[in-house]
Regions:
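Periplasmic solute-binding protein
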Residues: 1-5, 19-20, 27, 90-105, ...
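Glycine-centered hinge/linker elements that transmit conformational signals in sensory
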Residues: 5-39, 83
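Extracytoplasmic/periplasmic substrate-recognition and gating elements
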Residues: 31, 71-137, 187
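Short helix-initiation/N-cap motifs at beta->coil->alpha
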Residues: 35-52
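Pocket-flanking alpha-helical
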Residues: 45-49, 65-73, 211
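Alpha-to-beta junction loops
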Residues: 47, 52-61, 76
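Beta->alpha turn/N-cap motifs
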Residues: 60-66, 84, 100
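Long, aromatic- and glycine/proline-rich binding clefts that accommodate carbohydrate-like moieties
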Residues: 81, 131-191
Length: 217
């Protein structure tokens, strides 16, 4: 969405095209049935016995959770690939999501001590080696060199970061990233997955729901 005008950056037809793809994935058994996979939603696929047993071919994951997914089935060989894109796509489908931000507030009682910690956290070789790839690939070349040297730089995460760095991407706007919008989208996809609605009807309903929500903001 355009954060200033609240206008959609896509059409109802675009939504239907996406939902047609979702339906085809379920219809052709590319995805596990929605009735089964719903138990492992909310980034919990690593707990799915089928994933652990190596019965799935691939999955989507945040760069920061790739090592969580691979740790759930250490006997498999993993690779990192590109996001699928529709023909004629105007965007490459990648969005930057940075949920953790460290800052020293104006009400901090010991700002100097807090800044010393941040200096250690971001600039100390020891801290960079300790944190390693716990929360994704380190953002600085120095930290990556340290992690590569001590063997803590996950190669799959590094490959994913290199792929993402070549994308133009988008930043999350305040409307599409809002919990209400996310729930509307998730409910729509789930309804198509369960077969309780068709892509065209679902697209129309989703467009109306999002329009109603955003116009009220």
């Amino acid at each position: 969405f355009d954060a200033d005008s609240k206008e959609f950056n896509y059409t109802e037809e675009d939504i239907q095209n996406c939902l047609d793809l979702v339906k085809s994935l379920y219809d052709n058994n590319v995805c596990a049935p929605a009735s089964y996979s719903s138990a492992y939603s909310n980034d919990d696929l690593q707990s799915d016995p089928n994933w652990i047993a190596g019965k799935y071919v691939c999955t989507f994951a945040y760069i920061s959770t790739i090592n969580v997914m691979t740790a759930a089935n250490e006997g498999a060989t993993y690779g990192t690939g590109y996001l699928p894109l529709l023909d004629g796509a105007k965007d490459n489908g990648w969005a930057c999501n940075c949920p953790q931000v460290l800052a020293v507030t104006s009400t901090c009682k010991a700002p100097e001590a807090a800044m010393k910690f941040l200096d250690y956290f971001f600039n100390s070789d020891d801290a960079e080696s300790t944190l390693a790839c716990v929360r994704s690939v380190p953002p600085t070349e120095k930290a990556r060199e340290i992690c590569e040297k001590d063997g803590t730089l996950d190669p799959n995460m590094m490959t994913a970061a290199n792929i993402a760095s070549g994308y133009s991407g988008l930043t999350n706007d305040k409307y599409s990233s809002a919990p209400e919008s996310k729930q509307i989208i998730a409910d729509t996809i789930e309804a198509v997955g369960y077969g309780t609605t068709d892509p065209a009807s679902a697209a129309s309903d989703m467009y109306k729901q999002l329009s109603s929500y955003i116009s009220a903001q």
